[in-house]
Swiss-Prot record:
One of its GO terms (molecular function) is ribose-5-phosphate isomerase activity. It catalyses: aldehydo-D-ribose 5-phosphate = D-ribulose 5-phosphate. This is Ribose-5-phosphate isomerase. Pathway: Carbohydrate degradation; pentose phosphate pathway; D-ribose 5-phosphate from D-ribulose 5-phosphate (non-oxidative stage): step 1/1. One of its GO terms (biological process) is pentose-phosphate shunt, non-oxidative branch. InterPro entries: NagB/RpiA_transferase-like (IPR037171), Ribose5P_isomerase_typA_subgr (IPR020672), Ribose5P_isomerase_type_A (IPR004788). Pfam families: Rib_5-P_isom_A. The keyword Phosphoprotein does not apply.
Amino acid sequence: MSLDNCKKVAAYKAVDDFVKDGCKIGIGSGSTIKYAVDRIKELGLKNVICVPTSFQSTQLIVEAGLELSDLSRTPELDITIDGADEVDKDFNLIKGGGGCQLQEKIVAYSSKKLVIVADHTKESTELGENWKKGIPIEVVPMAYVPVMKKLESSSFSLTPKLRMAVNKAGPVVTDNGNFIIDAQFSKPLSNIPQLAIDIKMIPGVVETGLFVNMTKIAYFGQTDGTCKVKSI
């Protein structure tokens, strides 16, 4: 089974388990979320309200004909369904490979439950075991050089790179008008909760792609067509 089909298996199973009539749902971003939106549409549920985490998920919601809202009108959500770049044994996450971690974190924090859906390659024992692109860090444009220098210092010993755009000249610009630094690490991360706090405290850092203590359940689609559900 292809990775796309693994993603579909996970997304369909999570939607079937958690999304009911009248649900207020945060819709994450990334390649797996398309399948979650497809399944919500297929089920034909009534009075389902969807809050997006990015321009991409806004488009998915609109194209599916689902009811679109935002946190101003719907500030409390029942559930957010989102993907992840990596999930470790303690349910620490790295997110932000698609550059949407700030809005994803805001929407997830506004939800009673965050459910992660992914293919089997996103499950690991420690962060960095499978995901090799580093921690995505959203920064104010004027601060990206000082932030990178701080991340390189002995306080962090990370290797930061400004994420560059593919189809335009210059850096990637987020939906919020900020830049993204990918902070790579050469060995498994330790004390992830403290690391997330320390990076966030650097002036100019808007948000990090480290999600700590935000979810207790993840769905991983397997190559044999089954779905592995992990929870704590």
